[in-house]
A protein has these predicted regions:
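N-terminal Lys/Arg-rich, disordered targeting/topogenic segments
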Residues: 1-11
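A compositional/structural signature for long, glycine/proline-rich flexible linkers
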Residues: 14-471
Length: 471
């Protein structure tokens, strides 16, 4: 049987050719290969480096003196003690089934020991992302269980012996690591249970292990007004010198992976050398011109991630999330549409921009998503459907509801089926428990989250039903 995931990946990869041609033709006129090759390389360099721009998310999160809900100094956890509202802008398409505890680890000086509590069976997962957005380790219910434990995270060049009470050593290929933890919380009623568990997450420098370590307070930092701007908006506003200059700086501490050799050769030909500063005014003029032209890739990438292969309007995220290899297109696409997405075996993310007739969602219309009794998402934990505006943020509404989750008091039909009403106005008091408020106008998109999904989700034998427009 043909693997649908392979079809998805092939389709996304093939779009790089269309993408590059679109950039080349955008300026009009005919190009020779000599003229077009730098641009061909420039677009690929842009796509290759795009996930590394998650460094802007790091900047936003760590430019604070003390740990809070949405930010913390380096090597400390920011603990989300309650679900955010529609004003949240730090990360796109964030979920509302799990409370996050997130840290940015700097492994430049020494390894860190990550300590987790006994969650008494409560579901949690901590994904360790390198700066290329690959997940090099996953800690939690599925992989390591829910008992307390200590795990060491070491940088690529560390040599030494871990403490005897460390369960496992995870080696990061990059200096910086995004420690992205989430723990199931069924709304405010669970906060009193989950918050104390979250606050037991801890990162301890190896040199302080065995001591009574307290993370530093009131850490000095340099205020940066740009951190108030959503990271994707900051990227879209960059010029070529800033974008590729930042990439060159990041490559000093976060080396390309061994399989990236051909891409590194392309970067070198463009004048972007690993470990060296980059100044666009000092490179070959044809390369500089190509890199400036390549910046339009952002807007084309934005469109490309919305046209993944779908069934009944739903696109299933590629199966290589978190383990991309040289699949740079998928890697950039996921960084664009859902930075922080974990591996499908932990969470599956069907996404819909269109209804069952493949028409874009419109806030002026009304929709119904119906699950037959035997069609409910198969999961070992929890599932939900969330709604977002075109930029990937919550849709403000009168009841402050941004998702419908299986733990909520949803009303099922007599035959066991479930209807969700997706529209701007209330469907009526008797149906309001199943109402997912949409914007009054304009487009929106939906993300289903299936935590620890059944194998039928992973092999696509189970699929989401289409969202039908109400006539």
């Amino acid at each position: 049987m043909t693997d649908p995931n392979n079809k998805t990946k092939r389709s996304m990869r093939s779009r790089i050719i269309v993408l590059i041609l679109a950039v080349i033709l955008a300026g009009g006129g005919w190009w020779t290969w000599k003229e077009g090759r730098p641009l061909f390389y420039g677009v690929q360099a842009y796509i290759y480096g795009f996930p590394m721009m998650m460094d802007l998310t790091r900047e936003t999160a760590t430019t604070v003196p003390t740990a809070g809900q949405f930010g913390a100094p380096v090597n400390q956890f920011a603990v989300m003690t309650e679900y955010p509202d529609a004003s949240f802008r730090a990360v796109v398409r964030t979920g509302l089934d799990t409370l996050f505890a997130v840290a940015w680890a700097d492994l430049d000086e020494e390894p860190l020991v990550l300590s987790v509590p006994d969650t008494d069976g409560r579901y949690y997962v901590i994904a360790l992302f390198d700066m290329w957005t690959n997940i090099f380790a996953s800690i939690g219910s599925r992989t390591t269980g829910t008992e307390a434990g200590h795990f060491m995270v070491a940088g690529p060049n560390w040599q030494g012996t871990p403490p005897p009470d460390v369960k496992q050593v995870y080696r990061s290929p990059s200096r910086f690591v995004w420690v992205n933890g989430q723990m199931r919380a069924d709304g405010p009623k669970d906060y009193d249970v989950v918050n104390p568990l979250q606050k037991q997450y801890k990162l301890t420098p190896l040199s302080a292990w065995g001591e009574q370590y307290t993370p530093p307070q009131e850490v000095p930092y340099t205020a940066n007004p740009d951190t108030k701007i959503p990271p994707l908006e900051r990227i879209s506003n960059m010029d070529a010198g800033e974008y590729f200059g930042r990439l060159a700086r990041l490559l000093k501490d976060n080396q390309p992976l061994p399989a990236d050799g051909p891409m590194v050769d392309m970067l070198n030909e463009l004048g972007i050398e690993v470990g060296k500063d980059f100044d666009i005014s000092r490179i070959d003029p044809s390369s500089a011109k190509a890199l400036r032209r390549a910046m339009v890739t952002f807007s084309i990438l934005e469109k490309a991630v919305h046209v993944m292969p779908t069934k009944d309007g739903w696109a299933v995220m590629p199966s290589d999330i978190g383990d991309y290899g040289t699949d740079y297109v998928n890697r950039a696409g996921i960084a664009f549409v859902g930075l922080g997405a974990v591996q499908p075996i932990d969470v599956s993310y069907p996404v819909a921009f269109n209804d069952s007739e493949d028409e874009p969602f419109d806030g002026a219309s009304r929709y119904v998503l119906r699950f037959d009794r035997d069609q409910l998402p198969p999961t070992k934990v929890i599932w939900s459907v969330s709604i977002y505006d075109p930029d990937g943020f919550y849709v403000p509404n009168s009841i402050n509801r941004y998702n419908l989750s299986a733990w909520m008091p949803l009303k099922y039909n007599e035959d066991g089926s479930l209807d969700m009403y997706i529209q701007a106005e209330s469907p009526g008091v008797d149906k309001e428990s199943n109402w997912l408020p949409a914007p009054a106008s304009g487009t929106f998109n939906l993300v289903t989250r299936i935590f620890w999904p059944d194998s039928s989700v992973l092999d696509n034998t189970w699929q989401m039903p289409g969202v039908k427009k109400v006539q």
